[in-house]
Regions:
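Extracytoplasmic beta-strand-rich oligomerization domains located immediately C-terminal to a leader/signal peptide
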Residues: 1-131, 141, 227-228, 233
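Short linear sequence signals and composition-biased patches located at protein termini or domain-edge surfaces
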Residues: 42-44, 129-233
């Protein structure tokens, strides 16, 4: 669907920003600043994978010395169960469709408290004006069946588990060459005339294959996003 393609394009653009910062950046690095953090789903019926992407930016003010204030942002993509009511199944009780919604959130780093600011209340540098660049979770697309992220190294091999600042693959934190992304979405309305079991293969993990007996059409969009700012160290 077009909405799923738009989502994938958005994620690709953010992945390409992962790890970017200006050469004179003065923000002290912490474990919260790893460029890409992928959290794998533990229950495919209730959750999808999650990705957090961190990159830097700068605000210029010629009247100040130094003229630049450096910033750090974190963008997250994650799933929650859909809140769309399944009208065909809802009688006395409210029943939601068997799908996920994908959300996006953007936060800004607070160097003073060494924590991510609340995007609902954070402000522009040196101002009391709300920073409109950040936001709490915003729904991007619904009717999603799964969202998968895989960290891939320079040899095209899957990094498993995905690296964090402290786990067994932490030496690969800055060696993620690409991120494989798979989004599977179902049609809003029934598509096929006949209801029968249909299987949609998952990316790299047979346990995540989607097997449903219904009339809905399911399509997967799979793409590899290059991390152009990683692997340079």
């Amino acid at each position: 669907s077009q909405s799923a393609r738009n989502l994938v394009g958005m994620i690709v653009r953010d992945v390409r920003m992962a790890g970017f910062k200006y050469f004179n950046d003065t923000i002290k690095e912490t474990n919260d600043h790893i460029p890409i953090k992928i959290t794998k789903s533990k229950n495919f019926n209730t959750d999808c994978d999650k990705i957090e992407i961190v990159y830097g930016d700068a605000v210029a003010n010629a009247s100040k010395n130094p003229p630049y204030t450096y910033e750090r942002f974190r963008v997250s993509y994650f799933c929650e169960r859909s809140k769309i009511v399944d009208k065909a199944k809802s009688g006395g009780n409210t029943v939601y469709i068997d799908a996920f919604a994908i959300y996006k959130k953007k936060e800004k780093w607070d160097a003073n408290s060494s924590s991510w600011k609340n995007p609902d209340t954070d402000t522009l540098v040196g101002s009391s004006v709300k920073d409109e660049r950040t936001y709490s979770k915003e729904k991007v697309v619904d009717y999603v069946q799964d969202l998968v992220f895989h960290a891939i190294d320079e040899n095209g091999k899957l990094i498993s588990p995905p690296p964090t600042a402290t786990n067994s693959t932490k030496e690969f934190v800055y060696k993620i060459k690409t991120v494989d992304i798979a989004v599977t979405k179902r049609s809003r309305k029934e598509f096929f005339k006949e209801s029968k079991i249909r299987t949609k293969k998952s990316l790299e993990d047979d346990k995540r294959d989607i097997k449903k007996t219904d009339k809905y059409l399911r399509e997967s969009i799979i793409i590899s996003a290059n991390t152009r700012n990683l692997g340079l160290l």
